[in-house]
Design a protein with these regions (language model features):
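N-terminus-centered regions that define maturation/targeting leaders and the start
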Residues: 2-7, 22-225
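Sec-dependent N-terminal signal peptides
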Residues: 7-13
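C-terminal motif of bacterial Sec signal peptides marking the signal peptidase cleavage site
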Residues: 17-21
Length: 225
């Protein structure tokens, strides 16, 4: 009889504990779902990033045109990179012309930047510094190594490919659309203050307080276009 009483008491205690847990809203945690390789791939969605100049102080724009690239259109095959493995790419820098910049301009910087490059920091394809204010255009192909088409004292930085030249666009297959920003920046100083070994990021940091205007062509390009 005593043994039966103990069993009944134990069952009653367990029942009370369950009821108490339910009455306070406590529930057992569900086991965590296992993440599969398919789930990870599904989460890896390529998103077009914001304008890289959006976070800089606002400055006026001016007119920038080109005979070889068009704003809002993909880079032509000649402006893509055979060096980086694009079939048919020729790494020829585009022709550029600009006008309407402020009278206080004393030099220009020309660049091409891909903010969507899979690096975590974008990719500088071309950077030319210390272009004198009397220059208002660059011919196609001015971005070759040791270019004679650049006006003195302009020079090319190494860029992210490690070479002082134009490196064409090279969007990796399956990485979506890359917005190539071809930009002419007007400065109120005759020299940028950097050397050819500087990164595009360092140049940008250095010239930011001296930027008086900026003009940009955006060429959205994906692999195979």
């Amino acid at each position: 009889m005593k043994r039966t009483t103990l069993i009944v008491a134990a069952v009653a205690g367990i029942t009370l504990a369950i009821v108490t847990g339910c009455s306070t809203g406590t529930t057992a945690a569900a086991p965590a779902a296992r993440q599969t390789a398919t789930d990870v791939a599904a989460e890896h969605v390529f998103v077009r990033g914001p304008d890289p100049y959006e976070f800089l102080p606002r400055v006026p724009s001016f007119t920038l045109t080109s005979q070889t690239v068009r704003n809002g259109r993909p880079l032509p095959i000649a402006q893509l990179s055979g060096i980086l493995g694009v079939p048919g790419g020729k790494d020829i820098s585009p022709q550029l012309s600009w006008s309407g910049f402020p009278a206080t301009t004393k030099s220009f910087v020309v660049s091409m930047y891909d903010p969507q490059a899979p690096t975590g920091s974008g990719f500088w394809h071309w950077v030319v510094a210390d272009i004198p204010a009397t220059t208002t255009s660059l011919p196609a192909g001015a971005g070759v190594p040791g270019s004679s088409s650049l006006p003195s004292p302009a020079f090319q930085l190494n860029g992210d490919a490690g070479a002082p030249r134009y490196i064409g666009g090279a969007p990796p297959k399956g990485s979506g659309v890359h917005d190539y920003y071809i930009t002419v920046t007007a400065l109120d100083v005759p020299a940028s203050g950097v050397t050819a070994s500087a990164s595009g990021a360092l140049l940008g940091f250095t010239i930011d307080p001296h930027t008086v205007a900026r003009a940009t062509l955006i060429c959205p390009t994906s692999a195979g276009q």
